[in-house]
UniProtKB/Swiss-Prot annotation:
PANTHER family for the chain: PHOTOSYSTEM I REACTION CENTER SUBUNIT IX, PTHR36082
The keyword Membrane appears for this protein: yes
Key words, A-Z: Chloroplast, Membrane, Photosynthesis, Photosystem I, Plastid, Thylakoid, Transmembrane, Transmembrane helix
Source organism phylogeny: Eukaryota, Viridiplantae, Streptophyta, Embryophyta, Tracheophyta
Protein family per UniProt: Belongs to the PsaJ family.
Bilayer topology annotation: Single-pass membrane protein
One Gene Ontology biological process: photosynthesis
Function: May help in the organization of the PsaE and PsaF subunits.
Protein source organism: Psilotum nudum
The protein's name: Photosystem I reaction center subunit IX
Thylakoid is among the record's keywords: yes
Transmembrane segments: 7-27
Subcellular location: Plastid, Chloroplast thylakoid membrane
Amino acid sequence: MQDVKTYLSTAPVLATLWFGFLAGLLIEINRFFPDALVSPLF
């Protein structure tokens, strides 16, 4: 179990999860607000 916890806390795994989440968020924002130069959410 310790090995799995160590693996899941490494930088490549965390970076992959973060960039995947960020890409999904940007895709959804562009789906609801297409061609927006400034996000209307802020």
